[in-house]
Amino acid sequence: MRMASNALLTACLSLAITGCAQLSALQLAGSAVGMVLEATGITKKEGDPSKINRDMSVRIYAGEQLNLSATGKPLSLVAKLYVLRANEKFKAMTYPQMTSGEAEKEALGEELVSVREVVLLPGKSYDITLKVPGDATAIGIAGMFRAPYQGRWKLAFDNKLSFDNGITIGAHACAFNASKGTLVADISPESMRSLVGVQCNS
């Protein structure tokens, strides 16, 4: 009888150890998957898809004749990169609002996820990575040009359609143009891929 009890106890312990080993293996596998997700720019957070961040690649080429002064001298340019939940308020945002921090925040309201400023220098290129949450729908880019050409001081991109190839733009004397990324048509028509017709005012 005692021998049978010992055998039963040994069997139970063996099952418990096996179960723990299997659990540890599953935990290790889960950790490995998590590291792969982070390495590919996807941060896994349970329960709320809006908290899953992806990396958006943005490249900006600053032309040699960047943000020209009244005498034709190239100047630096402050570019602003916006991660947005929607684009309606960005569409309505005016140039004076964009250049004033408080007015800018008030104009964009709850649509604004984040904004980042980059100082561009003539003839330089910039590779920028934006963290974009799942509830964001657009990437906005605006430039504080000295004398902006009409609506060409800002661009808007559909972020979900732009992840694969990223966003590439050019910054010039008084305007932006876009070469990569899916533009939001009612803010940035396809004509914004070219500088044809752009005339800078002194």
Where are the model-predicted features located?
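A short, structured loop/turn motif at beta-sheet edges
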Residues: 48-52, 131-136, 161-163
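Gly-Asp-aromatic-enriched flexible segments
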Residues: 57, 150-154, 158
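Bacterial Sec signal peptide processing site at the extreme N-terminus
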Residues: 14-40
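Short amphipathic, basic-aromatic surface patches that mediate peripheral association
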Residues: 58-70
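Bacterial N-terminal signal peptides that target proteins for export
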Residues: 1-9
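Mid-length scaffold segments of soluble, non-membrane domains
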Residues: 74, 81-152
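Solvent-exposed, flexible loop/coil segments flanking beta-strands in beta-rich domains
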Residues: 31-59, 194
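Glycine-rich, aromatic-bearing surface loops/beta-hairpins
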Residues: 155-202
